[in-house]
Amino acid sequence: MRIFAMLLALFALPALARDAIKVVYHFDAGLEQATKGLRNIKNHLDVDPKAKIVVVAHAQGVNFLLDGAQNQSGNPYNIPVEELAAKGVEFRVCEITLKSNKIDPKKLIPEARLVPSGVVEVARLQAREQYVYIKP
């Protein structure tokens, strides 16, 4: 039995090493955090293009996903979001935040997908789907 366990571990480790790393980026602090976080994600994918990345936005973190949102230099956020989405990055927005701030979901850019709660989504991804957590 012990030899079987050792053989299983020996052959399972290379398979695990090939699996894509799953990462949840947590945005909740406004446009400056979004600028930094989007740059982090681009760099992340440059180094590890197989990474599975989900951005969860709530509170002030949803603002960069609103149609027409711009960074501090006046550059639109939708362009880097579109580029990252084309690489498989998912953008999830807290429905509670939208309701409490009276933001019409139609104001979100097309890449954004609603989830019932941003905080619950972050917890679910970590606990149930083994995502690692990054907060830029």
Can you say where each PLM-predicted feature lies in the sequence?
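Positively charged n-region of N-terminal signal peptides that target proteins for export
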Residues: 1-4
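Hydrophobic helical h-region of N-terminal Sec-dependent signal peptides
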Residues: 6-10
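N-terminal signal peptide c-region/cleavage motif recognized by signal peptidases
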Residues: 12-14
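Secreted/extracellular ectodomain signature
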Residues: 17-136
